[in-house]
């Protein structure tokens, strides 16, 4: 009888507040990722940074874990269709954030930023506008392929330092 009552009450309980929180977290995640991408682009342009972008990435990773927990709580407490969507979304964004975090270790190895870093920085800044919930990345892939082709046409590095900088 108790389980039946719990199931019936769960069917009528309004989880709209939790759902709205998740949607708000999604927008916050998109905004923060856009900011982080722009800061990373500025870092590659060797601009003076007021804040440490790497510390900000680490701090936001912690926040992402809170969002994932909220998504699991929503899934565990509802019978609504597609509650796993929010979990998948936040886990995808966390994976993207971890890629940015790992990029830090690679960028730190570069002694002198090659000119290609500016091209990459511009592409990263371009990509920031496309960090939205629904995006089909066809245009971004085409642009990346164009950049890749342009880089293949460039002159080969002359010094070891230049070679290592480009390789990273």
Map each language-model feature to its residues:
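Long, hydrophobic alpha-helical segments that serve as membrane-spanning/inserting helices
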Residues: 21-87, 91, 102-168
């Amino acid at each position: 009888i108790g389980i039946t009552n719990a199931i019936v009450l769960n069917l009528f309980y309004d989880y709209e507040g939790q759902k709205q929180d998740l949607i708000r977290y999604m927008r916050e995640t998109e905004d923060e990722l856009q900011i982080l991408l722009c800061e990373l682009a500025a870092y590659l342009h060797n601009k003076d940074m007021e804040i440490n972008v790497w510390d900000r990435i680490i701090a936001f990773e912690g926040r992402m874990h809170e969002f994932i927990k909220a998504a699991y709580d929503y899934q565990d407490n509802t019978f609504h269709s597609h509650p796993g969507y929010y979990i998948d979304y936040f886990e995808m964004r966390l994976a993207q954030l971890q890629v940015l975090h790992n990029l830090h270790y690679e960028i730190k190895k570069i002694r002198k930023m090659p000119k290609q870093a500016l091209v990459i920085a511009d592409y990263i800044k371009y990509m920031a506008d496309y960090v939205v919930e629904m995006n089909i990345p066809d245009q971004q892939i085409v642009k990346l392929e164009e950049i890749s082709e342009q880089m293949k046409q460039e002159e080969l590095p002359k010094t070891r330092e230049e070679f290592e900088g480009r390789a990273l």
